[in-house]
């Protein structure tokens, strides 16, 4: 069973998100290293944030930047010596047991998603394939930049109902 966290897990790159999504059911936001978009910061403000960044020097610099922008963030740090897969020393190279052990204290018993939106609804509402409409919805809900898949996940994680979504589109 996947771990559901009481907050949004923030990681550096897509490889980290892909690796962790096999074990964590919560929303995972990728900050793309030092190039953290303002829309991502805006989306994360006011939410429970769990920072899980690479234990290298670059990861520490990104952590420092995010902590200054999002001061109530929870910092989860992995021992660099536990990252033994391959030559890189990032979250995606760490042993999953070590990561889950560190994240377990932020876990909740069940998934809190109450949204009634299905992915097929996004197709019917023309949110998949219509970048302008998707951007309008994302801007109104302060969801940051989203492709169709990310929009779906963020709507679910923010418990946006189908009725609310239809009202925004009108």
Each PLM stretch: what is its role?
Residues 22, 34-170:
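TOPRIM fold recognition
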Residues 4-48:
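Acidic, glycine-rich catalytic loops of TOPRIM or P-loop NTPase phosphate-binding modules used
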Residues 1-4, 170:
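Short, Lys/Arg-enriched, disordered terminal segments
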